[in-house]
Structures are given as structure tokens and as C-alpha cells.
């Protein structure tokens, strides 16, 4: 019975709290700040693997993230614990990405609803990764990598694995 309850709790958590991986093409460590556009409190080092963060809230394209960051692709998967802020940890949306789990066709909508008009985009744009912009209920607004298209997708269709695709 405990396993069923735990699974149910995790399923709800996964649908309402999205995750994203860090893709910072600057060639330098990624800054984590104490507020949107605030003081840098930690730098996330470059790695051969990837980092996955939990997105908590957004303010002016800055995402507040959970203080535990999952590290993938190293010899052993590990966790990086952020330190140095009493006001939370913030990272800019432009270095956060995720993919689409399953078939990407008709996933993006003009409005945050299954009844919203499906957006017809080239599949290659959807495979290049999406940047998170805002959350409304169980929907997340995203921007394509080329910054030319935005749309809404269900949070449960997020693939936040930086090393593989999600079924």
C-alpha cells in the first residue's frame, strides 16, 4: 500500500512541478542568482553530463529553482546542493531547456487547453529543445530555440532528460 501511495504522490508531483536541463552555450559556468537579475551566489561548473533543475516559479523570465540539482552522465549520478542564498536560487530561462516526451505532433497549442488551436511547426524546431516561459495550471508556455515561436504544452509531456529522449 505504501508503494502505491508513494507512486501516486510522485505522479502528481511530476505533473505539477516541471524540470528542465541546463544548456549554457557561453562556455563558462552557469550563474545562479539570489533574485531575478540579482547577485551571483553560485556558479554551476561545466560538465560532460548534464544538470536537471526543478522549476518552482517564474518572474520576468527568471526561474526560481530548487536548491538540489541532479547531475547526470558522470561516473555516478550525483546531486549538487546550492548554497549562499536565503532568498532562493534563480536562473535565466535562456539556459533552461527540455524536450517533448512522445510524439511532438500537435503538442503545442495557442492557448493552455486541449481545446486550444494546435500550432503547426516544423518537427525539427521541436526537437531542438524548448525554453520554459511561464506556467498556468498544468500547462507550460514555451519558446523554440530560434525564439520565433511560442506555445503551450501540458507539463506531463516535458522530457527533462539531457542525455536521451523520452518515450
At which residue positions do the language-model features occur?
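Phenylalanine-focused residue identity feature
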Residues: 7-8, 98
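Sec-dependent signal peptide recognition
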Residues: 1-7
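Surface-exposed aromatic
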Residues: 140
Amino acid at each position: 500500500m505504501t508503494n502505491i501511495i508513494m507512486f501516486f504522490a510522485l505522479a502528481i508531483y511530476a505533473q505539477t512541478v516541471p524540470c528542465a536541463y541546463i544548456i549554457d552555450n557561453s562556455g563558462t559556468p552557469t550563474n545562479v542568482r539570489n533574485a531575478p537579475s540579482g547577485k551571483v551566489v553560485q556558479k554551476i561548473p561545466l560538465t560532460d553530463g548534464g544538470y536537471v533543475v526543478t522549476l518552482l516559479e517564474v518572474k520576468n523570465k527568471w526561474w526560481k529553482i530548487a536548491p538540489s540539482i541532479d547531475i547526470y552522465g558522470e561516473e555516478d549520478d550525483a546531486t549538487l546542493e546550492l548554497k549562499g542564498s536565503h532568498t532562493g536560487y534563480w536562473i535565466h530561462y535562456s539556459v533552461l531547456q527540455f524536450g517533448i516526451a512522445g510524439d511532438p505532433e500537435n503538442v503545442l497549442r495557442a492557448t493552455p487547453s486541449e481545446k486550444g488551436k494546435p500550432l503547426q511547426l516544423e518537427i525539427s524546431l521541436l526537437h531542438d529543445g524548448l525554453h520554459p516561459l511561464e506556467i498556468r495550471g498544468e500547462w507550460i508556455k514555451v519558446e523554440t530555440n530560434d525564439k520565433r515561436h511560442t506555445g503551450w504544452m501540458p507539463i506531463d509531456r516535458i522530457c527533462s532528460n539531457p542525455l536521451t529522449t523520452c518515450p
